[in-house]
Amino acid sequence: MDYKQYITIVEDWPQEGIRFKDITTLMQNGTAYKRAVEELAVYAKEKQADVIVGPEARGFVVGCPIATELEIGFVPVRKKGKLPREVIEANYGLEYGKDCLTIHKDSIQPGQRVVITDDLLATGGTIEATAKMVEQLGGKVVGIAFLIELAYIGGRDKLKQYDLFSLMSYE
């Protein structure tokens, strides 16, 4: 399926010079969204994932349905101050700023096979921070899956030690 036809490009958002790839139009089409989730779930199953991990917020709308499809757990990664129990944290840079992510200390068990999911790979900062926390907790990142890769930004280089999969790439 040509998923790009379901992505809306928004110029100069959230700041000037950014060509934002809006996945909400993909999600609004039930067939396209379902097929995208199914393709990403096949990848996660091939990686023998025990759990799916996704950063907020769009990582939730990608990762939760994959976890449901595979009948495995989903672990949310949230911005600082959003998780109620004891957490570890990692700072990261993104396409248009900097922030801090957290994950519950008890959310990943040593040796668990983890597939990280998100809507988009740009600089790789968000996913690098997420992977670092998963590994700090003893998990093994066996794959990382995206709806979209912005290849021209080069985030893949930052994540070269991991197996990456994306449904769409923008050069």
From Swiss-Prot:
The protein's role, per its UniProt record: Catalyzes a salvage reaction resulting in the formation of AMP, that is energically less costly than de novo synthesis.
Protein name (Swiss-Prot/TrEMBL): Adenine phosphoribosyltransferase
Main location: cytoplasm
Native source organism of the sequence: Shouchella clausii (strain KSM-K16)
Gene Ontology terms: cellular component: cytoplasm
Domain of life, source organism: Bacteria
Catalytic activity: AMP + diphosphate = 5-phospho-alpha-D-ribose 1-diphosphate + adenine
UniProt GO BP: adenine salvage; AMP salvage; purine ribonucleoside salvage
Pathway info: Purine metabolism; AMP biosynthesis via salvage pathway; AMP from adenine: step 1/1
Gene, per the UniProt record: apt
Keywords linked to the UniProt accession: Cytoplasm, Glycosyltransferase, Purine salvage, Transferase
Gene Ontology molecular-function annotations: adenine binding; adenine phosphoribosyltransferase activity; AMP binding
Lineage: Bacteria, Bacillati, Bacillota, Bacilli, Bacillales
Similarity section: Belongs to the purine/pyrimidine phosphoribosyltransferase family.
Alphabetical list of InterPro entries matching this protein: Ade_phspho_trans, PRibTrfase_dom, PRTase-like, UPRTase/APRTase
Intracellular or extracellular location(s): Cytoplasm
